[in-house]
Amino acid sequence: MFKILNTKFVRSAPVVAAIWLSLTAGIIIEFNRFFPDLLFHPMS
């Protein structure tokens, strides 16, 4: 019988990478929503 929370699958590299990239993208998107112009520094 398959356990619902299989720790070997959850701790595998693709799952950890997907969670990490989703979290990072969410942080950047929310930061850009509240502070829209801080991620792009113009040269002038």
Swiss-Prot record:
Chief localization: membrane
Entry keywords, A to Z: Membrane, Photosynthesis, Photosystem I, Thylakoid, Transmembrane, Transmembrane helix
Annotated disulfide bonds: none
One matching Pfam family: PSI_PsaJ
Location of the protein in the cell: Cellular thylakoid membrane
Record-linked SUPFAM superfamilies: Subunit IX of photosystem I reaction centre, PsaJ
One GO CC term, this protein: photosystem I
Coiled-coil segments: none
Record field: transmembrane: 9-29
InterPro entries, per database record: PSI_PsaJ, PSI_PsaJ_sf
Gene Ontology BP, a term: photosynthesis
Bilayer disposition of the protein: Single-pass membrane protein
Source organism, top-level taxon: Bacteria
Family: Belongs to the PsaJ family.
UniProt function note: May help in the organization of the PsaE and PsaF subunits.
Record protein name field: Photosystem I reaction center subunit IX
Highest classification ranks of the organism: Bacteria, Bacillati, Cyanobacteriota, Cyanophyceae, Synechococcales
